[in-house]
């Protein structure tokens, strides 16, 4: 993952919109087939990216129960927000 890239977690999207937990994840699932990993989102696997996931959790960027994390790029974020806005 390019460290300089601005990313959004699903939790951050839920909270910024005042949505219930899981709303952004459901939108992501609907759009996932049209997304490209590395362009639209980054998938962090707990086995390989555990330290980064722990830092995201400590920073409050992901839900406490998150095992594997999804971070959306600007492009992915815009697509999810557009989907949620209908």
Name each model feature, range by range:
Residues 1-29, 42-86:
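Positively charged, aromatic-accented nucleic-acid-binding surfaces
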Residues 30-40:
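Short, solvent-exposed alpha-helical "recognition" segments
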